[in-house]
Amino acid sequence: MAASSRAQVLSLYRAMLRESKRFSAYNYRTYAVRRIRDAFRENKNVKDPVEIQTLVNKAKRDLGVIRRQVHIGQLYSTDKLIIENRDMPRT
């Protein structure tokens, strides 16, 4: 993979993770982060430049979807789950 293409993929990976961590819902947040990591690990050995570009374009579309869903989730936020409350003492 060319250096510029590698930098582009890493930048896209970081942007997707960063944006996914903004989901207000715990389940969406953990699923999105896990799915992004799995997808990038699955495709880390791809060498064909055409296939890499196809995957990058798909990831850019997915990043747009994540941004849109994060925004919608913030409009209709819900209470935090018990698992998210770290201030509560454990018994």
Swiss-Prot record:
Task: Give the pathway.
Answer: Cofactor biosynthesis; iron-sulfur cluster biosynthesis
Which coarse location class applies to the principal site listed for this UniProt protein? Answer: mitochondrion
Q: Which keywords, in A-to-Z order, does the entry hold? A: Disease variant, Mitochondrion, Nucleus, Primary mitochondrial disease
Task: List residues binding pantetheine 4'-phosphate.
Answer: R6, K44
Q: Which GO terms describe its cellular component?
A: iron-sulfur cluster assembly complex; L-cysteine desulfurase complex; mitochondrial [2Fe-2S] assembly complex; mitochondrial matrix; mitochondrion; nuclear body; nucleus
Compartments annotated for it: namely: Mitochondrion; Nucleus
Q: Which InterPro entries match?
A: Complex1_LYR_dom, Complex1_LYR_LYRM4, ISC_assembly_LYR
Tissue note: Reduced mRNA levels in Friedreich ataxia patients.
The keyword Nucleus appears for this protein: yes
The GO annotation for biological process reads: [2Fe-2S] cluster assembly; [4Fe-4S] cluster assembly; iron-sulfur cluster assembly
Extract the signal peptide range.
Answer: none
Q: Name one GO molecular function term.
A: structural molecule activity
- Sites of N6-succinyllysine modification: K47
UniProt lists the family membership as follows: Belongs to the complex I LYR family.
Per the UniProt record, the associated disease is:
Combined oxidative phosphorylation deficiency 19: A mitochondrial disorder characterized by respiratory distress, hypotonia, and severe lactic acidosis in the newborn period. Other features include gastroesophageal reflux and elevated liver enzymes with normal synthetic function.
Q: Give the quaternary structure.
A: Homodimer. Component of the mitochondrial core iron-sulfur cluster (ISC) complex composed of NFS1, LYRM4, NDUFAB1, ISCU, FXN, and FDX2; this complex is a heterohexamer containing two copies of each monomer. Component of the cyteine desulfurase complex composed of NFS1, LYRM4 and NDUFAB1; this complex contributes to the stability and cysteine desulfurase activity of NFS1. Interacts with FXN; this interaction is nickel-dependent. Forms a complex with the cytoplasmic form of NFS1; this complex increases the stability and cysteine desulfurase activity of NFS1. Interacts with NFS1.
Function in brief: Stabilizing factor, of the core iron-sulfur cluster (ISC) assembly complex, that regulates, in association with NDUFAB1, the stability and the cysteine desulfurase activity of NFS1 and participates in the [2Fe-2S] clusters assembly on the scaffolding protein ISCU. The core iron-sulfur cluster (ISC) assembly complex is involved in the de novo synthesis of a [2Fe-2S] cluster, the first step of the mitochondrial iron-sulfur protein biogenesis.
The protein's name in its UniProt record: LYR motif-containing protein 4
What is the originating organism of this protein? Homo sapiens (Human)
